[in-house]
Design a protein with these regions (language model features):
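Beta-rich carbohydrate-recognition and catalytic domains
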Residues: 20-96, 104-155, 163-219, 227-277, ...
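Bacterial Sec-dependent N-terminal signal peptides
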Residues: 1-21
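C-terminal transmembrane module of eukaryotic multi-pass membrane proteins
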Residues: 283-284, 298
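Peripheral membrane lipid-binding modules
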Residues: 100
Length: 328
């Protein structure tokens, strides 16, 4: 009996270890000495996966702002840091910081959309372009977009998500209400032949397209990420502020402006006490690979934000609704 049990463990152990190793857990330690990576966005560029993510000031320096880290992978699991993008390197040295990247591959180049950071209500969406995915040149017209102040927005724009739908580009962004208390989603549009510069974008709706409603969404909807299935757009979004806990929801639309939640409950919850993501599962990015498979990248931690890791899970679809492969 003992010999049979030993043989069984010997056979299964390599597969168990392989399964454990296949769980992506990425944390960039270059800035503050501990894993600290947020706001992931992934593209397939020239056959290699590139992940862009937010990194904090070096050693929490008060004179240096947030930046964007760059990592590459061939399997979406194992990632190597290959560089970083800063306000100085991109050509916007007057900005206090930059973070929350969104990347788009067009005609052999990577277009990076990111937010200025550190200016409160004046934070806005910016744009830069790269030929190699690592070295970027900023748009001379930066910032390219922020909404005008109105009864629903203070004029701030962060967490850009840019996508093309029905011949137009949609720029999804998070903004605060005039009291700077509630975070909610807005959207701007541009023509299909846009160069993404300032002046190209028009706010598409004079109210939030998605605002917090359910208890789990708290006072915040942010971090929108878009994918397509059939004639529908799906938005994966973060509900509630960081570590409240933040969790992930899904909404659906046929026009990119009017959205309906798929459920009153989170699609991806924070982990149970003791698990790596017990403080949150947040700021999603839904990556669609060239073969059509979809993966949910998101950030998490279990120490109220002292560290931040990025992971991913494959998303499967049935009857127009997504579900996690790990939970099937």
């Amino acid at each position: 009996m003992k010999r049979a049990l030993f043989l069984l463990v010997s056979v299964l152990l390599p597969f168990m270890l392989w399964a454990q190793q296949e769980r992506m857990m990425f944390g960039d330690t270059s800035r503050v000495g501990v894993p600290y990576s947020k706001d992931p966005h992934v593209i397939n560029f020239n056959g290699t996966y590139y992940m862009y993510y937010s990194i904090p000031p070096k050693n929490w320096s008060k004179t240096e702002g947030w930046g964007v880290g760059v990592a590459t992978s061939t399997d979406l699991v194992n990632w190597n840091r290959v560089g970083e993008i800063t306000t100085a390197s991109v050509g916007n040295p007057d900005m206090k910081g930059m973070c929350a990247p969104c990347a788009l591959v067009l005609e052999g180049k990577v277009h990076l959309f990111y937010q200025s950071y550190g200016s409160g209500k004046r934070d806005a969406i910016c744009h830069a372009v790269s030929s190699d995915g690592v070295r970027f040149v900023a748009d001379r017209s930066n910032p390219i977009y922020r909404p005008e102040e109105a009864d629903w927005t203070c004029g701030r724009a962060i967490d850009a998500e840019v996508t093309k739908y029905k011949g137009r580009y949609f720029l999804y962004f998070a903004t605060r209400d005039p009291a700077y208390k509630i975070q909610q989603q807005g959207v701007a549009v541009a023509k299909g032949d846009t160069d993404f510069s300032a002046g190209s974008w028009t706010t598409a709706c004079d109210k939030p397209i998605l605002a917090p409603v359910y208890d789990w969404e708290g006072l915040c909807i942010e971090g929108a990420s878009i994918c397509y299935k059939g004639k529908k757009m799906y938005m994966f979004y973060a509900g509630s502020y960081n570590n409240a806990p933040q969790q992930i929801g899904v909404a659906v639309s046929r026009d990119g402006i009017h959205w309906k939640r798929l459920s009153a409950e989170p699609f991806k919850r924070n982990g149970k006490p003791g698990e790596w993501n017990s403080s949150e599962s947040g700021h999603p990015h839904l990556f669609t690979d060239v073969d059509g498979r979809t993966y949910l990248f998101y950030q998490g931690n279990n120490d109220k934000g002292k560290t931040w890791y990025i992971t991913q899970e494959e998303v499967l679809w049935k009857h127009g609704k997504p579900y996690l492969k790990s939970e099937q």
